[in-house]
Amino acid sequence: MRFLVTMHMPSYSGNLVHQMNVEHKSTSLEEFVDALSKEDFVVVEEFYRDPTTGSDNSRGMTAINHRYVGKIKVINQHR
């Protein structure tokens, strides 16, 4: 399932918060939150949107720390 995760840490461009488009094997928001709360780090696949083509491209696997997560939103993949 795809999620937009707002992290309380600087972004690549120097902003104070960092948003990540990630995919995790969870089947719901509640399941993803449960996975985050059980471990210090959760492995996700990170994606970025290509501004030219509009397609989502993988940046590979990333481990995120639940202590820096400020907000999580489900991304609707059926656009």
Name the predicted role of every residue range.
Residues 1-40, 70-79:
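Acidic, Ser/Thr- and proline-rich intrinsically disordered linker/docking segments
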